[in-house]
Regions:
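Amphipathic alpha-helices that form helix-helix packing interfaces
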Residues: 411-414, 418-421, 437-448, 459-473, ...
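Secondary-structure edge/capping motif, primarily at the C-terminal ends of alpha-helices
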Residues: 389-390, 422-426, 448-455, 472-477
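Cys/His-rich short segments
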Residues: 135-213
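Structured secondary-structure scaffolds
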Residues: 2-43, 50, 62, 181, ...
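A glycine-rich helix N-cap at a beta->alpha junction
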Residues: 85-106
């Protein structure tokens, strides 16, 4: 396992900053980003990104949306709209939803749109050619269902009932499932392996052989060893092992279709496009690396000879796509490399059940961020605490409101008291940090860094250091203690609360974002307006106003 970037002690400069690139799994562009998305891999990676930057590392990031995923076609057909237009419209809304929560990436592209498509096709085909050259492709016939939704004029590729059109029972856990995967247990399967197969747009009338490209890794246990190298947690490794025991180190790389990135071979009996949950999924990351390389003038972080530390993240429903599809594609050729760490999370529920757009059982990230006078920073803290890292967690609106208001009230009192004290200092007074408080800050910083370890990430524990720091100053502190507390709050709070901590950091006379190495470096300069936390309490009416419909009980 590759060693994680070193985190220097508090107040010590990073002598060996690492290059880090973060590329979470894309979002399907068939809808907006809700709090279930945001509180999972995206807030998680935003916090990690800020933590590493705070420690002095060079961090870049990229994200995409998938406009070719089959569920885009399903929604486009239902709404009678061009799939590309629908996908790009949701791409724009997703960008707004995530940015509303302070979740931003250096590059956030729609690779299927406009001029991006040529770059995307180039990197996708380069991957497939590399896999072919390495002997990692197998062409074989798979039985696929055909339904009666089309007509005699319907192209062969569009008559297959696959992806969002296909439903059935998971062959592994028996849960209701669809497409090629089961959200309940995380497993993937071929349509002819599903029990009780049905078409969601008509009736299955026959099964026919279709030749597609499949990934095959021949070296024994190569995938399992790669998972160990990437510090995959045991529960997700078990999902991967179960898949390999059932299907071997193989996975589908192409599907029949007309809307997608095509790859041609004389072996095929229909037009084939790259599969969104293996080859195309990896191609999204390669696209991000290519885009970053163009901007930075350096080789792609995914190039085989790059020493950039690569981090990926996704939810449990993408366990097999990442562990077998993406990791397998990385191992199966010599041009591109695998992730150094992949972080998985479980589902975040809403009032005990999954987020559902159709039932109005959803809170859009961009909607809650528009609640008047809401503190996005406090909301991020609340969401981080219920990040589903070890099991499913539940976003209960009443509990969210209570927790939000409790954190807001406590932080506002201490924060505003300390900024008022510093603001009232004589201009001739020098600023110093308190040694005893710095010892406490050092302990809490180490505690937070442990929670943010890339070997065992627990974003849900990160706020503990911040809340404990709130109790480290009395009700009428000396200005030296108030100053130390504010410096510490900037350092500890930045990964979770970037808006208020950056404003505080700048007001305290520092540039850029909070840096751990500068924790004990005071400045007598005050820049701009005094920062304050004046947000109002969150109410049930605020939450109700964010919903397409009443939250399901």
């Amino acid at each position: 396992m590759r060693r994680s970037p070193i985190i220097a002690p508090l107040s010590v400069a990073n002598a060996n900053p690492a290059d880090v690139y973060i590329s979470p799994v894309n979002l399907t562009a068939n809808g907006r980003a809700h709090l279930g998305h945001a509180a999972g891999p995206f807030l998680r990676m935003d916090v990690v990104q800020r933590h590493l930057k705070r420690a002095g590392h060079h961090v870049r990031s990229g994200l995409t949306t998938d406009g070719f995923e089959n569920h885009v076609l399903v929604r486009a057909a239902r709404e009678n709209i061009d799939p590309s237009d629908l996908a790009h419209g949701f791409h724009v809304e997703i960008a707004h939803d995530l940015a509303s929560l302070g979740i931003v990436f250096d590059h956030f592209d729609d690779p299927a749109y406009g001029k991006n498509l040529q770059r995307f096709s180039n990197v996708s085909n380069a991957l497939m050619e590399a896999l072919s050259a390495a002997g990692s492709l197998e062409f074989r016939a798979a039985r696929l269902p055909v339904d009666d939704a089309g007509s005699a004029l319907t192209p062969t590729e569009e008559r297959f009932c696959i992806g969002g059109w296909f439903g059935g029972t998971c062959p592994v856990c028996g849960a209701s499932a669809g497409s090629f995967f089961c959200e309940q247990c995380g497993d993937h399967f071929e349509p002819d392996e599903a029990r009780n197969p049905v078409s969601r747009r008509g009736r299955i009338v026959e099964w026919t052989d279709n030749i597609s490209a499949f990934l095959t890794i021949t070296r024994n246990d190569q995938l399992v060893r790669a998972w160990d190298d990437a510090a995959i947690e045991p529960g997700f490794v078990e999902i991967g092992r179960r898949y390999i025991a059932r299907k071997g180190q193989r996975m589908r790389l192409t599907v029949p279709g007309l809307h997608g990135v095509a790859w041609n071979s004389q072996q095929f009996n229909t037009r084939q496009i790259l599969f969104s949950y293996s080859s195309l999924l990896y191609a999204h990351s390669l696209y991000c690396g290519h885009k970053d390389a163009e901007a930075s003038g350096t080789p792609s972080a995914f190039a085989r000879n790059s020493d950039t530390f690569l981090i990926g993240a996704t939810g449990i429903d993408n366990t097999i796509p990442m562990l077998v599809g993406v990791t397998g594609c990385a191992l199966g050729q010599e041009s591109f490399r695998q992730f150094d760490r992949i972080f998985f999370n479980h589902f975040l529920l809403l009032n005990g059940s999954k987020f559902s757009t159709s039932r109005g059982h959803v809170i859009w990230a961009g909607e809650i961020a528009q609640v008047p006078d809401i503190s996005i920073d406090i909301l991020r803290v609340c969401l981080s605490e219920i990040c589903p890292e070890e099991a499913e967690t539940d976003l209960n609106p009443k509990q969210l409101i209570d927790r939000y208001n409790a954190i807001l009230d406590k932080i506002a009192v201490v924060f505003n008291r300390c900024t008022d004290i510093i603001n009232a200092m004589p201009s001739s007074a020098a600023c110093h940090v308190d040694d005893a408080m710095m010892l406490t800050l050092n302990r809490l910083y180490n505690q937070q860094c442990s929670a943010l370890s890339l070997d065992h990430l627990r974003v849900s524990h990160v706020s503990r250091s911040v809340t404990e720091w709130l109790d480290c100053v009395d009700s009428n502190p000396h200005y030296q203690n108030a100053y130390t507390w504010l410096m510490g709050f900037s350092i500890l709070g930045w990964p979770l609360m970037p808006r208020i901590t950056e404003a505080l950091w700048h007001w305290l006379g520092h540039e850029g974002h909070p840096i751990a190495a500068c924790a004990a470096r005071p400045s007598s300069v005050r820049s701009g307006r005094i920062p304050r936390i004046d947000g109002r309490s969150l109410t049930a009416a605020d939450i109700d106003g964010c919903l397409p419909g009443k939250v399901a009980p």
